Amino acid sequence: GVRIAGDSMEPRFVNGQTVWVKAAQDANNGDIVLCTLNDQGYCKKLCKDENGIALISLNKKYAPIPVREEDEFRIAGIVVG
């Protein structure tokens, strides 16, 4: 499992919680993913639409993180539990 750090995914995932991840290099819109963006690791909800890709926190106090074309972005896995 992977340990969550921080409160950006509350209330579904809390600081210090361990989540289980299925290795994957792609994911569907709405999946909770483990990914890297410009060498920074994230656990976020994946949003894919006509505007591109964004990483969404479940905690509303955090703004979405847009993934730009020039960014180095890689999905490592999908959170399954």
Language model regions located:
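Acidic/glycine-rich C-terminal interaction modules and beta/coil loop segments
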Residues: 1-81
